[in-house]
Amino acid sequence: RHIERCALLLILVDMAGTDARDPRDDYKHLLAELELYDKTLLKKPRIVAANKMDRPEAKAELAKFKRRYRTVDVLEISCLTGDGIERLKKELLKRVTALRGREKVSRRADQ
C-alpha cells in the first residue's frame, strides 16, 4: 500500500542483462505487475535508474532500452562504483518536491 502514496516511482533496472535477462523485458514485466496491482500506478510519474552502467555490455543494452521506451526518463547509475547516485538523489528530490507542491495547491483548490 505504500506505493499508492508515492508521488514518484523509481524503477531500478539491471542494464547489464545479468543472467541473460533483457532489461527491456524486465521493465515491461515490472509495469505489468504494477498494472495488476493497481492500474492507476501506471499514471504516476516515474524514473528508471539504469543500474550496472559500470559493466561494458550495459551501454548497448541502454541504447536498445531507450529506443524502445523513448518517453521514459532514464538516469544512469552504478551501485557498485557509486557513479550517478548523487545525480539520481538530486533529481528525485527535485521532482518529489515539485510534485508534492502541486498536490498541496490542488488540495487547497478542492477545499
Regions found by a protein language model. Give the residues of each.
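An anion/phosphate-binding loop that grips the pyrophosphate of nucleotide cofactors and donors
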Residues: 6
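Oxyanion-binding "anion nests"
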Residues: 13
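C-terminal-of-GTPase-core extension/linker across diverse P-loop GTPases
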Residues: 18-111
